[in-house]
Amino acid sequence: MVGLSIVGRGGGIWIAITLVLVFMDRSRTRGAAVVLLALTLAFAVTDLAIKPVVARARPFEGSVATRVIDRRPLTYSFPSGHAASSVAAALTLSRLWPAGRLVLWSLATLVGLSRIYVGVHYPLDVVGGAMLGLACAVVANRLLTPRPPSTYRDPHR
């Protein structure tokens, strides 16, 4: 589980999967941009906007003794940035690699669970991060996916 927690750190595994998919098929570059934007949004919203405002202490900082298996993060606990980036990446990468959905979502789920297992997040941190990641993926997709021209015609023209 520590390995999964490390794999999710910094979004590196998701960027690597994206690069491999683009290397295999150059037509996936727009989709890769969506993945990278979703990861960037997930980081910005969790670590720069929400964590400093909520300022929730990590489980190992409380009165109950919590065993920490991984290194102790210096940031606040809620929401989980690992869960946010993993869900954002799994959702956006699923569009690039539909056959890999099971692998992507399994990895995202295991990364989230690993954060609880290694003692650095509460379950609600992971759930909140996952919901945030979902929202970031939807926003990134909306911003970077071209829309067909509107067929609406103004009747007064």
Task: Give each language-model segment a name.
Residues 17, 64-157:
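Membrane-embedded catalytic cores of phosphoryl/pyrophosphoryl-handling enzymes
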Residues 1-47, 51, 123-157:
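Terminal transmembrane helix and immediately flanking juxtamembrane interfaces
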Residues 31-33, 38-72, 76-79:
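Helix-adjacent hinge/juxtasegments
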